Amino acid sequence: MQSRLVSQSGLGRRWAVLRCALSKTYQRRTLTSTRRQFQDVFQSQLEDPTSAALFSALNSSKAVPQTLTEKIVQKYSVGLPQGKFVKSGDYVTIQPHRCMTHDNSWPCALKFMSIGASRLHNPDQIVMTLDHDVQNKSDKNLKKYRQIEEFATQHGVEFYPAGRGIGHQIMIEEGFAWPGTLAVASDSHSNMYGGVGCLGTPIVRTDAASVWATGKTWWQIPPVAKVTFKGVLPPGVTGKDVIVALCGLFNKDDVLNHAIEFTGSEETMRSLSVDTRLTIANMTTEWGALSGLFPIDSVLKGWLRGKATTAAMGLADGPFKTRAAERFTHPLLEQLFENPLTADKGAKYAKELFLDLSSLSPYVSGPNSVKVATPLKELEAQNIKVDKAYLVSCTNSRASDIAAAAKVFKEAAEKNGGKIPKIADGVKFYIAAASIPEQLAAEGNGDWQTLLEAGATQLPAGCGPCIGMGQGLLEPGEVGISASNRNFKGRMGSTEAKAYLGSPEVVAASALSGKLSGPGWYQTPEGWTEVIRGEGDGIREEDRMLTNEEALEKIIGQLDDLVADGEKRFASETPAVEESEQGLTEIYPGFPERVSGELVFCDADNVNTDGIYPGKYTYQDDVPPETMARVCMENYDPEFSTTAKEGDILVSGFNFGCGSSREQAATAILAKKIPLVVSGSFGNIFSRNSINNALMGLEVPRLVNRLRETFGSGDKVLTRRTGWTLTWDVRKSQIEVQEGPGGPKWTHKVGELPPNVQEIIAKGGLEKWVKNAIGA
């Protein structure tokens, strides 16, 4: 565990602010307190032995305790100032342990070559897999696959061909996603690596090309949410039920763009297998999170020991030659657990949620939305006919999942004279293993054969129906139940179909019965009333038993909050002191020290990338900048083009830029010659694409709310010229807003834009930054 002491200068400031904060608190209570009185009170605290011990502990405590997420990012951040400890909100340059690309490897390669790169910075950092369109045998797709394989061979990259398995599963079973490391992938379900204690998070193609060429890209550390599990899962309830319930019960964007850390008592976490954790972590993507991290604990250690033993016996590879045996070794395992990374006591979380697993029952997601989750029992009563069932995807198609599905048919065989029953008439049941090793394991147990005997249709190991590709897609009017991770309208076929998500046993039972149903393994506990969940850690204050150390940590945490409040007051009331003591942000040469403009307000939340740049232009590569400027925001407001002017600052509501990953959503705004976008919050991919393409952005909820207070009454105006102006002082990390001629003027602190990100924007975006870095 990393540790650090407060520097003398940092401690001095901490005490100064704490004195100031305590003084103001005391003044608010007495209305007559003076600084001299405060000093006397403070001195009296030091004379009390208990208080003296507290302040002594505060003296030697860590300056800012880190979450597990922050600790891992700390390890893989480069170019940090000496003594810098990263925290949520920081922009950092990261050098990830691994970077995986799949079928999009060829577009990444084209981008890589277009920037003048000729060799990979570190071939061992890169993994390439073919998994998405593996059923497509067209000449065009096979040519692309050959090009990817040739590129990988030329550059010495570990490559996994079509049919070997899904990239995320390969990252896990081949040891690329190693506990305590940072791994990225150009795919949204890289969150899955968190199931083995590896911080996995998605990147876009330009980022991947940057990692290939330089070994690095950038990342803004998200706010971190702690999710505490209590109790243990009842028989018949699975990890899929856990994450489906979380998506449906906390469905107000509770963890949108957060990094999640799952925790719980030793008993609770011991009850969650690695396969269960992988399922939960995988679907944190659908919950809106950027990562889903489980602890590095005894459960994981046992799983890794099994992998290391298998590798040492030469059994890890099967018919496939890999280097897994070099990654799964007992010496590496012992080294990992000598001092495993954990969150510091007192680490700050943006929010805390809890779920009592013992109160959970089987859940089903949908139709056509992960935000709709219903207890299976309620849906069974509706006799919903099922046309297609799917045991596929990286979420739930490992050997343990296949075994659970096979068990449904094996139990039914006991009532059928020992003969495996067939799936219901009119139902098609598709199965595809997450990888060939998982399929081989299922075959070794006889489970794969059981499903085939029941009438299942085998698909190649890889993606397929779950991403709307290949055989078995839903037709108009059909109903499907799938063990995959995403069920929005049209995802698995027709937009006129209904898609539900459930556990492997629910999928199997539904295929067998012909209607949405379960195997009957779950029995409602006596006295059950509801799923127990909420904010916090779920421990009632009257039940909270704290050790002296924990009580001290709690008090220190409360004092740290008081310090933070005092710093805010200190900053607002004594700006000169703030600047001299905290310093100013360094400005990268060529980056503007100030950005100013008139505010044009698009008053809407969830403006998606299709609203910003119409989809019909997305795959036209020859659209000139003038046309991009003209169609910018066209699907949101056709009048935007004539209302917004060059040099304006665009302000919109919350979750601006959600939706697809099209880079043109950023470049179209730049084509309109708007240099800065301000919103209540941004979609994560839009944020990445903005910086990668040199568009500046600020999150200022206060400004959005103030604009709505001022202009909210009367007729709705989609795009409004406000007459307000904003000046962003980059050095001070502060904006100044002038509410029209003669109106109020106010300032507000904003997040720091550090020099490493300024450099990317000043160079004209990430591609040009990479060109400069490699001397192309």
Curated annotation (Swiss-Prot):
Its cofactor is [4Fe-4S] cluster. GO terms for molecular function: 4 iron, 4 sulfur cluster binding; homoaconitate hydratase activity; metal ion binding. Pathway: Amino-acid biosynthesis; L-lysine biosynthesis via AAA pathway; L-alpha-aminoadipate from 2-oxoglutarate: step 3/5. Binds 1 [4Fe-4S] cluster per subunit. InterPro entries: Acnase/IPM_dHydase_lsu_aba_1/3, Acoase/IPM_deHydtase_lsu_aba, Aconitase/3IPM_dehydase_swvl, Aconitase_4Fe-4S_BS, Aconitase_4Fe-4S_dom, AconitaseA/IPMdHydase_ssu_swvl, Homoaconitase_mito, Homoaconitase_swivel. It is an enzyme of class 4 (lyase). Catalyzes the reversible hydration of cis-homoaconitate to (2R,3S)-homoisocitrate, a step in the alpha-aminoadipate pathway for lysine biosynthesis. This is Homoaconitase, mitochondrial. It comes from Emericella nidulans (strain FGSC A4 / ATCC 38163 / CBS 112.46 / NRRL 194 / M139) (Aspergillus nidulans). The gene is lys4.
